[in-house]
Regions:
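Sec-dependent signal peptide recognition
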Residues: 2-10
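C-terminal motif of bacterial Sec signal peptides marking the signal peptidase cleavage site
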Residues: 15-17
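Aromatic- and glycine-rich peptidoglycan recognition patches
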Residues: 19-43, 48, 188, 196-216, ...
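Boundary regions of SH3-family modules and the immediately adjacent low-complexity/disordered segments
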Residues: 22-147, 151-155, 162-166, 171-173, ...
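Second-shell loop/turn segments in exported
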Residues: 157, 227-228, 274-279, 297-306, ...
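...with weaker cross-activation on analogous glycine-rich loops/strands in unrelated enzymes
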Residues: 163, 327-396
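Glycine-rich catalytic cores of cysteine/serine-nucleophile enzymes that process amide/ester linkages
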Residues: 200-201, 221-267, 298-309, 367-418
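Active-site nucleophilic cysteine motif
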Residues: 292, 302-333
Length: 450
């Protein structure tokens, strides 16, 4: 005689780990992870961002992007901020790559090497020659809040401020005592990078580099080669280079490399024609879907670690292709760009109604504390979003907190993981916590919910 498990027993087995839950949340399983599939014939013909407006936005982008070459003192890396970076880690030494607490000598050595008693000691211009990482302290070693855990240990290295692509303009503020690290600013933040990852630039280089048109990479992991097919640098969506010319199979770009004296020189580089575009790429639904599909399924990368993206670097790189400037931090992206709409204090139903009514697909950002999302449009009366997300908070029967790991860029509803039996709803649902929307398209536009 066969014995059947009751629903209660099955639920207990799932919660206790005896039966594996589905690897992906329901939204990822059931929603097509293809941006092109969400456009109707109407949306394909819409022009939410007039060409003249996009051109002005791109000009503003370039002005901000190159601003570091036209300053003579730190803008982001103010002394108090730099000193604070060391002070906060003196109070919380954290854990290293070996899952052991950093000894007090770890930070002391970094402080001595930083030699901040004469900060800033350099004040010069440069350009990155490699894809690199801006670190809060002059070290590649990590700092984790705990030795293990879904949100306090790997991959959440507190010292990772942001990745920076090759050939990004920088302002060099300070060089460490051993000359191996430099504290630099980009147009969007600051941090320490290895000195071998950048080269110095002079007035002539700046004049040449800033002149003319620019190209932007539109395919991840694109190898840019020299005229002899030798590797120069790897580009991904949102990386910018001066444009030289276009051919049927290749786009010719300017690439900055370091000479033996550490000075930047310009070489000609070549990218596949379908992997690059003249910046800005015209914004329309087809192109928006094409660029978003380049990022779909990409692994989550905290602060851009391992060449991947977190939520805000994904949105930032997406909009760079279209010449739309965004800050680096998720909250700043919503509060400092576009038309801000406060959603706090509203019911989940009211929030979704406003998002559907006022949101412009692929030109609107949604924000909850620590996370930014791209609104991509309606489906069946529900709003859909595209975001690179680490996971959904969970809590088991013993009250232990955890994460249902998603760990990639996905299309979901505003309630991802709502079907999880162990979802942690103590602080409200995902939609409950969405606090604001920013519309990057010209104001005054509303979209009927479909």
């Amino acid at each position: 005689m066969k014995r059947l498990c009751s629903p209660v027993v099955v639920l207990f087995l799932i919660l206790s780990g005896c039966i594996s839950a589905p690897d992906n949340i329901r939204d990822v399983r059931e929603l097509r992870q293809d941006h092109a599939s969400y456009f109707t014939g109407i949306t394909k013909s819409e022009d939410p961002l007039p060409a003249a407006v996009q051109t002005r936005m791109d000009e503003d982008y370039n002005t901000i992007y190159f601003s570091v070459w036209h300053q003579n003192r730190p803008f982001h890396a103010l002394p108090d901020r730099v000193y604070h970076d060391f002070k906060k880690y003196s109070l919380k030494p954290g854990y290293g790559e070996n899952k052991k607490l950093h000894p007090p000598s770890w930070l002391k050595k970094l402080q001595n090497n930083a030699s901040l008693n004469n900060y800033p000691n350099t004040l010069s211009r440069g350009i990155t020659t490699r894809n690199t990482n801006l670190r809060e302290l002059p070290t590649s070693s990590p700092h984790f809040n705990s030795s293990d855990g879904d949100s306090s240990a790997w991959p959440f290295d507190n010292l990772q401020r942001s990745s920076v692509s090759a050939n990004t303009p920088i302002f060099v503020c300070h060089v460490s005592a051993d000359k191996s690290w430099a504290l630099v600013e980009t147009s969007f933040t600051y941090g320490w990078i290895p000195v071998e990852d950048f080269a110095s630039v002079d007035d002539e280089f700046v004049k040449i580099w800033e002149s003319g048109r620019f190209a932007v990479i539109i395919r991840d992991q694109t190898s840019i080669l020299d005229k002899k097919d030798r590797f120069l640098v790897r580009g991904s969506v949102g990386h910018i280079f001066p444009f030289i010319s276009n051919a049927s199979d290749k786009m010719q770009l300017s690439v900055a490399v370091a000479d033996r004296h550490g000075k930047a020189v310009i070489q000609r580089g070549f990218a596949p024609a379908d992997a690059a575009a003249v910046k800005p790429l015209r914004f329309n639904p087809v192109n928006a879907a094409k660029i978003a599909n380049e990022m779909i399924g990409e692994p989550y990368g905290w602060g851009g670690l391992y060449g991947n993206r977190d939520c805000s670097s994904m949105t930032r790189d997406f909009f760079t292709v279209f010449g739309i400037w965004l800050p680096r931090h998720s909250e700043d992206q919503v509060k400092e760009a576009g038309t801000y709409i406060d959603l706090r204090g509203l019911s989940p139903e009211e929030k979704e109604r406003i998002i559907l009514q006022k949101g412009v697909p692929y030109l609107s950002l949604l924000w909850r504390k620590g996370h930014v999302m791209l609104y991509i449009g309606p489906k069946g009366g529900r709003a859909l979003i595209f975001h690179n997300i680490w996971g959904i908070r969970t809590k088991d029967l013993q009250g232990r907190e955890g994460r249902k790991i998603i760990g990639q860029a996905v299309i979901t509803t505003l309630q991802p993981g709502q079907e999880l039996t162990n979802i942690d709803s103590s602080s409200g649902s995902f939609l409950d916590n969405i606090a604001a929307m920013s519309i990057l398209a010209p104001s005054g536009r509303e979209n009927p919910a479909k």
